[in-house]
């Protein structure tokens, strides 16, 4: 965005892609996924305008990391820097693709950062009412499809004038009240309107890390276009977050003709062509005993 603002005559392509792989039988295994999303940024967008208003909240925490360490050859009995498994350097690097993490601690960090960033953004916008009511849909990072709806309950209560006083963290029953709220008909209706459209693709793809939020945006727009609903002039709220921990909040407004862009995206049609594999094949792929070349693949470019 800054590049295009500084060079309005130019356009930029942003590519978000990643692979979310976790250990077999770990609590993160079911969230695995992979994919990519490409976005075209220009001064005259045909889909959505993004204002230069962002709020960011950060705090240094150690909730997630991918193991990477070095071991000196002399420490494992290799003298004179002899070659070992093709390694010529005096140190051997050990790296593991699957992360070490504490899921519940991460969730606590995410809620803390997103809540702080959300209310910073509300202050930035000088919004006197309920901020999320001004958003047609809420687009959040989805490591699994229901993550956003489960995280957002605290913000939902805190920004609601009738609920804020009843939901105080100092209250010993705060979390039990919050759990009950998340199961209420009122909150379920809110989720169906604000989050469910983004969850459609996530439930079929899984976690894509950096690409996840923008896949949620595409899923939301494809869902509404499928229903024939005109979103011209409507605002989407974006809440990005991640381990480490950080959150960013911003808005996007749909421009006239947005549906013509979305009509070209065969998102759900493509996902319907996905092929199931048996558990044995999955385990072989995960352990790299078998490569993806031996499994039927589907590529999608739009």
Question: What kind of region is each of these model predictions?
Answer:
Residues 16-18, 42, 52-54, 142, ...:
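Short, structured patches in soluble enzyme cores that scaffold and shape functional sites
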Residues 110-126, 216-220, 224:
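Short, well-ordered amphipathic alpha-helical segments that serve as non-catalytic structural scaffolds
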Residues 2, 10, 15-17, 58-73, ...:
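Acyl-CoA/ACP chain-elongation machinery
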Residues 22-24, 93-103, 131, 196-199:
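Flexible glycine/proline-enriched surface loops and loop-helix/loop-strand junctions
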Residues 5-39, 44:
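Flexible, glycine-rich active-site loops centered on histidine and acidic residues
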């Amino acid at each position: 965005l800054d590049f295009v603002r500084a060079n309005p005559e130019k356009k930029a392509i942003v590519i978000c892609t990643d692979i979310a792989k976790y250990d077999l039988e770990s609590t993160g295994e079911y969230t695995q996924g992979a994919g990519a999303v490409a976005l075209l940024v220009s001064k005259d967008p045909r889909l959505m305008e993004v204002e230069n208003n962002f709020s960011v909240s950060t705090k240094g925490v150690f909730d997630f990391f991918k193991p990477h360490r070095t071991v000196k050859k002399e420490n494992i009995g290799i003298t004179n820097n002899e070659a070992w498994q093709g390694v010529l350097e005096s140190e051997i690097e050990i790296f593991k693709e699957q992360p070490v993490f504490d899921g519940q601690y991460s969730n606590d960090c995410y809620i803390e950062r997103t809540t702080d960033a959300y209310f910073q953004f509300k202050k930035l916008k000088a919004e006197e009412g309920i901020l999320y009511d001004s958003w047609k849909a809420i687009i959040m990072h989805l490591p699994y499809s229901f993550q956003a709806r489960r995280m957002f309950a605290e913000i939902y209560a805190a920004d609601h004038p009738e609920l804020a006083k009843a939901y105080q963290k100092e209250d010993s029953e705060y979390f039990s009240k919050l759990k009950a709220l998340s199961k209420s008909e009122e909150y379920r209706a809110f989720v169906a309107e604000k989050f469910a459209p983004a969850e459609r693709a996530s439930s079929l793809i899984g976690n894509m890390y950096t690409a996840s939020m923008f896949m949620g945006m595409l899923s939301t727009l494809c869902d509404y276009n499928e229903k024939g609903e005109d979103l011209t002039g409507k605002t989407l709220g974006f809440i990005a977050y991640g381990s480490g921990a950080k959150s960013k909040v911003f808005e996007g407004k749909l421009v006239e003709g947005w549906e013509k862009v979305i009509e070209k995206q065969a998102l759900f049609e493509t996902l319907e062509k996905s092929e199931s594999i048996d558990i044995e094949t999955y385990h072989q792929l995960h352990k790299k005993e078998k490569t993806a070349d031996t499994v039927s693949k589907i590529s999608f470019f739009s």
